[in-house]
Regions:
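Nucleotidyltransferase catalytic core that binds NTPs
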Residues: 1-143
Length: 143
């Protein structure tokens, strides 16, 4: 009997929407056991320049209750390799908006060095957290 293949899908998962659900559903094709890393508020602010609308404790609870997710953890470190050191996953799953970018190339290089595959999933163009955030900001300004 072979060992299970562990996947890791990190993300902010703010203002949870269909794109997030698609990522989690489709991530299961790459692994037997899916761990989702919910990026902490502090790391999200550091990486994206603004704090999520929904606090990470609530985002974590939402993700934990998605049937495709076997385990959810808070990602509270600046480098994905630090999460690998904790969790020892076999494949990291990212949106294909990373593919061919400097950050995607670095991710592939870093993980190749420790024998971890990088899998990409298509980005859902219909709905994004950025779009939802902009709509909310416009509504609040006009309120």
């Amino acid at each position: 009997m072979s060992e299970r293949r562990v996947g890791y899908a990190p993300g902010v998962f703010d203002l949870f929407h269909i794109g997030h659900l698609n990522v989690l559903r489709n991530s299961k094709q790459f692994c037997d056991y899916l761990i989702v890393g919910v990026v902490s508020d502090e790391m999200a602010q550091r990486n994206k320049g603004n704090r999520p609308v929904v606090p990470h404790e609530e985002r974590l609870e939402i993700v934990e209750h998605i049937k495709f997710v076997d385990e959810a953890v808070v990602e509270d470190v600046p480098h994905k390799l630090e999460m690998w050191e904790r969790l020892k996953f076999d494949v990291i799953i990212k949106g294909d908006d990373w593919k061919g970018t400097d950050k995607g190339d670095k991710l592939e290089s870093d993980f190749a060095a420790v024998g971890v595959d990088v899998a990409y999933l298509p980005y859902t163009k219909r709905t994004s957290s950025t779009m939802l955030r902009r709509l909310l900001e416009r509504e609040i300004e006009g309120f």
